[in-house]
Amino acid sequence: MSKINMNEDIDKDFSSHTPMMQQYLKLKAQHPEILLFYRMGDFYELFYDDAKRASQLLDISLTKRGASAGEPIPMAGIPHHAVENYLAKLVNQGESVAICEQIGDPATSKGPVERKVVRIVTPGTISDEALLQERQDNLLAAIWQDGKGYGYATLDISSGRFRLSEPADRETMAAELQRTNPAELLYAEDFAEMALIEGRRGLRRRPLWEFEIDTARQQLNLQFGTRDLVGFGVENASRGLCAAGCLLQYVKDTQRTSLPHIRSITMERQQDSIIMDAATRRNLEITQNLAGGIENTLAAVLDCTVTPMGSRMLKRWLHMPIRNTDILRERQQTIGALQDTVSELQPVLRQVGDLERILARLALRTARPRDLARMRHAFQQLPELHAQLETVDSAPVQALRKKMGDFAELRDLLERAIIDAPPVLVRDGGVIAPGYHQELDEWRALADGATDYLDRLEIRERERTGLDTLKVGYNAVHGYYIQISRGQSHLAPINYVRRQTLKNAERYIIPELKEYEDKVLTSKGKALALEKQLYDELFDLLLPHLADLQQSASALAELDVLVNLAERAYTLNYTCPTFTDKPGIRIIEGRHPVVEQVLNEPFIANPLNLSPQRRMLIITGPNMGGKSTYMRQTALIALLAWIGSYVPAQNVEIGPIDRIFTRVGAADDLASGRSTFMVEMTETANILHNATENSLVLMDEIGRGTSTYDGLSLAWACAENLANKIKALTLFATHYFELTQLPEKMEGVANVHLDALEHGDTIAFMHSVQDGAASKSYGLAVAALAGVPKEVIKRARQKLRELESISPNAAATQVDGTQMSLLAAPEETSPAVEALENLDPDSLTPRQALEWIYRLKSLV
């Protein structure tokens, strides 16, 4: 929190403060929770606790500014021209900043210059190029919860992409948070599931009324210019709309301008995509590896896109594979059709740049001159792209080409209006091209003519006075002046009026120079004011085309993704998978897309066959043998297929998949007080509750975090449930060799193993998948390979022989229903035992005792 410290004895009515500080305190009171950048001349100043906080966050000096109400005022400041760099640092630390500008004219103001907050910069609403990661989406999100489930909305303000969903349960909501990874998350003040969002960046607590459903509908209809939300398919999504309404209100509050690029909202439904929970996304290392970096991830291998907007779209595809095979087949067809034109298309696409985010800044009217120059450059690539795509014989490609548009008129406008290499800011001047506007050219000619005159004046005066150190200069405080060195200043003519004394020079003014100074400043000021006006008019000319421009940017991003996938398919030897309605996955010579790129030796490709008759594979073999790689590659091949990409295999045939689950590896979740085994069991429970017969399930080493018999029992029961009840497509890796007996007891279960060769104290991993169970685990050989001391390995071998002599069949213990007592219900007591328990032997005669013996014998 960044609040003014009331311990500073600041009066609530502000009357004891100077007028300037009164103005500051009133503005700060409107934004108590965030930092306030208060414009004063060429600096943004921060005061009180804001100053202390900013000095720590930005590593800038903390000073004092006089006194107000009798106390020194802590102060820190940053130059206005460097504000973007400081904002970037603050946003990266999750801070929000209110930008307060001078909107009045200091020359005409009585008292403090009028100021107001013109925008609020927050982590989820930034659109400035300097503040954004160019190849990552930057999302603002809002979450709502009621008794029926969750509402979740996300907005990418830098593209206008507005989405909502209604996760039914906590696991699905957690998966959505993991997938979208918002930069800023809004939640209601009474949100009950704080454990779900704790630790996330950019948390913002919002009042309940902002989530009110009627307000949400009103806000959204107002934004989209509609009477209802039926056309967007979200009319009945009340929980999602509550979140979306809060989000839109927050954006309007912070941006303080219209948002014409936010034109629609889309409902994301579970049935449209392949669902992956948070653990699955983490374990598959799609865009982030287990260490939190981006190296050796699926995206790192697959993403060779040439535009930032293409890179962001590819990552969205990877995190949300779709189930619509018509769209997927179109993507496959496009990839195949583009393979011969990759080398021609990519250099041209590279010149398009990040048109998507430029358009967002255009919509917010914050686009800078260089944004418009980049937009012009993107338009200049369109004719070449159209020419290259025109000859491609593919209906999807031609549909994309049509969406790209031409924009010849806008290209011509920007070529006439903006110079080739404009400055960073319009206030620097020199943005509008010569010839675009006659009056501007006239004012510039006056300014340039006056400047030429001043150059001639300097030469004339130097010759007239004979003073070789004489020169004409200018600064913002004293205007134009004639400067003479201290050594020659005594020779200055009598009509020179001293204006400023420096250490080594004197500065003078003459009437003629003052006259031309007025001309120069007037003409420059008029030119700059007109230039700003013309620049604003460019927005008015461009914005009516915003919808078509956004469609073009989306088409260009999609083209970049598909051209990239075509290049990756050719370069990495990927093939086109076939979709089928039959359940199962059949892979011939499948490879792990990431591991094969980092290996120094050739990757050993492996087959996989899952079908209704072979729904579960029990995978055995040594550690480091490749079990986890084999399992993950199956999931990654499936994932690539369901985004429309080619895949690393000789041939793939894939049936319907609704979810991908992974229970692979685990670590203690110390923050939540959960052990490795607890994490493992929680993830396992999620799979057993939510998997279906169309789910792809990867289970690696279930039950290893507890005692042998507990672990074996759990692994057996989980495998049995997945194979018999759920009937999911399952890869089940285990070190419990007892589980290799499952195929004999259940239909649809098969054994496969990864083999190794042991020679003396060395071991060679074959990494080749074979049918049948592994013959041994090679645990001691792997331990030796890891560098465990030889005496420990020797002792382990002795102990192994002892254990095997006690239980020769220990490696193949028969596990059946009678040995599952740990999880089974208590056995029923036999009739013989019940009879004996009810018998009183002291009351029996010898004859009765004999009769009981015969009766008990008959009961056994």
UniProtKB/Swiss-Prot annotation:
GO terms for molecular function: ATP binding; ATP-dependent DNA damage sensor activity; damaged DNA binding; mismatched DNA binding. ATP binds at G621, P622, N623, M624, G625, G626, K627, S628. Signal peptide: none annotated. Belongs to the DNA mismatch repair MutS family. InterPro entries: DNA_mismatch_repair_MutS (IPR005748), DNA_mismatch_repair_MutS-lik_N (IPR007695), DNA_mismatch_repair_MutS/MSH (IPR017261), DNA_mismatch_repair_MutS_C (IPR000432), DNA_mismatch_repair_MutS_clamp (IPR007861), DNA_mismatch_repair_MutS_core (IPR007696), DNA_mismatch_repair_MutS_N (IPR016151), DNA_mismatch_repair_MutS_sf (IPR036187). The gene is mutS. Keywords: ATP-binding, DNA damage, DNA repair, DNA-binding, Nucleotide-binding. GO terms for biological process: mismatch repair. This is DNA mismatch repair protein MutS.
